[in-house]
Amino acid sequence: MKMKKNIFLLTLLATVLLTLSGCANWIDKGQSITSVGSTALQPLVEAAADEFGKTNLGKTINVQGGGSGTGLSQVQSGAVQIGNSDLFAEEKDGIDAKKLKDHQVAVAGLAVIVNKKVNVKNLTTHQLRDIFAGKIKNWKEVGGQDLDISIINRAASSGSRATFDNTIMGNVAPIQSQEQDSNGMVKSIVSQTPGAISYLAFAYVDKSVGTLKLNGFAPTAKNVTTDNWKLWSYEHMYTKGNETGLTKEFLDYMKSDKVQSSIVQHMGYISINDMKVVKDAEGKVTPK
């Protein structure tokens, strides 16, 4: 009787060990990658990663911000699998674009935003440039009320800053002003600061801030697709060389119809497939 009891206990123990071993093997097979960089692209990648995870159990996409410069430098160093950027790698000093592979997954428009108490509705490109250069200091100079202009610029490492400087400022240096890297922080400050102006990815714009037309054109997806709204950039996801494994799976998912036709538009971005023009690393725009 005692022997039968011992055999039963040994069998039970073996079963438990096999079960635990199986669980350990399943856990060991869990995969994860990290995608870091552009805060303008971050909401889209986070939303897509959540949806991807629902049908790919055990596969995790870690998404972090930090800015386009951070994304490019970290993917180049091999610290992360994907570097997110509003910039072409060729535009960033210290980045060897030849060693990186570009995956364009969306287009992001940049809206010019103001505090809601600002009653100006439209600016020309020249007026906007003069504001950020410090030549226009009061809203009354462009048809608004007597209210000092408070500039909130983006950090030097920001892809949005590069897009704005290339498109609006050209060779004109911006005046020294407060700088913020995070889209969310920019929106918060502008919403609370009388006379404030900045620029923000479409995906972050809400009713807490006002938006301006530029040269009579509103900041809409339709105007971006035709380049009537000039402030836009590709959203790049860079890999170091050819993508493999989970990285390839996720990038293929980002380019899939499911993401491009639903998540991209729902999150306030523009699908690559909807663009009527193409832009190169030099900023030259041509019909598609």
From Swiss-Prot:
GO terms for biological process: phosphate ion transport. Gene3D superfamilies: Periplasmic binding protein-like II (3.40.190.10). It is found in: Cell membrane. It comes from the Bacteria. Residues 1-22 form the signal peptide. Belongs to the PstS family. A lipid is attached at C23 (S-diacylglycerol cysteine). This is Phosphate-binding protein PstS 1. It is a lipid-anchor. Its main location: membrane. GO terms for molecular function: phosphate ion binding. The complex is composed of two ATP-binding proteins (PstB), two transmembrane proteins (PstC and PstA) and a solute-binding protein (PstS). It comes from Streptococcus agalactiae serotype V (strain ATCC BAA-611 / 2603 V/R). Part of the ABC transporter complex PstSACB involved in phosphate import. One of its GO terms (cellular component) is plasma membrane. CDD domains: PBP2_phosphate_like_1 (cd13653). The keyword ATP-binding does not apply. A lipid is attached at C23 (N-palmitoyl cysteine). Keywords: Cell membrane, Lipoprotein, Membrane, Palmitate, Phosphate transport, Signal, Transport. PANTHER family: PERIPLASMIC PHOSPHATE BINDING COMPONENT OF PHOSPHATE ABC TRANSPORTER (PTHR30570), PHOSPHATE-BINDING PROTEIN PSTS 1 (PTHR30570:SF4).
